[in-house]
Amino acid sequence: MAADGQCSLPASWRPVTLTHVEYPAGDLSGHLLAYLSLSPVFVIVGFVTLIIFKRELHTISFLGGLALNEGVNWLIKNVIQEPRPCGGPHTAVGTKYGMPSSHSQFMWFFSVYSFLFLYLRMHQTNNARFLDLLWRHVLSLGLLAVAFLVSYSRVYLLYHTWSQVLYGGIAGGLMAIAWFIFTQEVLTPLFPRIAAWPVSEFFLIRDTSLIPNVLWFEYTVTRAEARNRQRKLGTKLQ
């Protein structure tokens, strides 16, 4: 516990703006949109978790593209220096500039890149063609819907204007297309060599770029290995 003398010391307190979102009191829609605007944080946590457990080079490259996208957003904001709407009613923001919206740029980069990955990178490997296309369509529509709602939330909560989220979305989409092409044409041919590095082998970093459908591959390999071990276990018990 803090000593009594510490409580009287003057201090300048600042919030952690990464997860600090304000909404109008008593506004249910604003409350829900405030949580929705935290989607970039959830995406980053998901990426870190996926990298820790999967350690796949394409996933690491995807996260690197998101980081580069954020750097470009910061650069554009500080070059244009367009203020946020309504004189900046929110004091706890990372920067006073709003053009382009970093939330919008982040989510549209994530959604557009994922869209390209689903339809251009992943290919059919089994006979369930209809179900494969169905889940891709549903997932793609869901990603685009979330990107739109996050962009809308920034306008609704007065963090950005429509033009700021629009240009953020355009910038994020263009960055996603450019990074996807760069990954496919430049980085992917290097992945087998990178995966063979001693440091990559030490950290169990792998390359699955030559596997058309990683989900189906992992499912079949895991099922085959489980059956093989089950047969061995049954033989030992006899």
From Swiss-Prot:
Q: Give the primary localization class.
A: endoplasmic reticulum
The reply to whether Disulfide bond figures as a keyword in the UniProt entry is: no
Give its E.C. classification number: 3.6.1.43
* Gene Ontology molecular function: dolichyldiphosphatase activity
Q: Which biological processes are named by the entry's GO terms? A: dolichyl diphosphate biosynthetic process; protein N-linked glycosylation
Looking up InterPro entries in the UniProt record yields:
Dolichyldiphosphatase_PAP2 (IPR039667), P_Acid_Pase_2/haloperoxi_sf (IPR036938), P_Acid_Pase_2/haloperoxidase (IPR000326)
Any one annotated GO CC term? endoplasmic reticulum membrane
Q: In which pathway does it act?
A: Protein modification; protein glycosylation
What SMART domains has UniProt attached to this entry? acidPPc
Look up and give the membrane topology term.
Multi-pass membrane protein
Its annotated function is as follows: Required for efficient N-glycosylation. Necessary for maintaining optimal levels of dolichol-linked oligosaccharides. Hydrolyzes dolichyl pyrophosphate at a very high rate and dolichyl monophosphate at a much lower rate. Does not act on phosphatidate.
Q: Provide the family line.
A: Belongs to the dolichyldiphosphatase family.
What the entry lists under PANTHER family is as follows: DOLICHYLDIPHOSPHATASE 1, PALMITOYL-PROTEIN THIOESTERASE/DOLICHYLDIPHOSPHATASE 1
Q: What is this protein called?
A: Dolichyldiphosphatase 1
- Organism annotation: Homo sapiens (Human)
